[in-house]
Amino acid sequence: MVKIAVLKEAASGENRVAATPETVKKFIALGASVAVENGASAGASIPDADYEAAGATLGTQTATAWDADIVLGVQGPDPKSLKGVKDGAWIVAGLDPFGQRARIDAYAKAGVEALAMEFMPRITRAQSMDILSSQSNLSGYKAVIDAAGAYGRAFPMMMTAAGTV
């Protein structure tokens, strides 16, 4: 059985999590076991209990990574956090391999493979895994919401999911 680990993001201000409880259910339905680090989704306001209800096991960073075949991340985890992963395990995250070369080299030295999700082809078949489009879309949406709040007046003819203002 493949073990998938979801670690808490270490970067300051990073509130996203690499897998939601819905995603965990899908992985388990495919025959994988999923371990989630305690508090991994606190910044995203998803309680640990939701992961347990989805079938994941919760634990410390070390217990979560121990014997993992795949480690999911929003950003690449610190190589020191990968103690105990299987030799040849996969790190699947946004890795910034050109800007974080030392981290990529540390993954190789630790015997793990790295899949930089930002290099996923931007084609229809891979659209559900395209992190650049989805995250850019969310960033743009949030920027408009923030701008509207700072503007102080209503935006005329603004079209939203709730209707047109």
Cite the ranges covered by each PLM segment.
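Glycine/serine-rich phosphate-binding loop and adjoining beta1-alpha1 elements at the start
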Residues: 2-3, 9, 79-165
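An N-terminal-biased, well-structured beta-alpha scaffold segment characteristic
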Residues: 2-106, 110
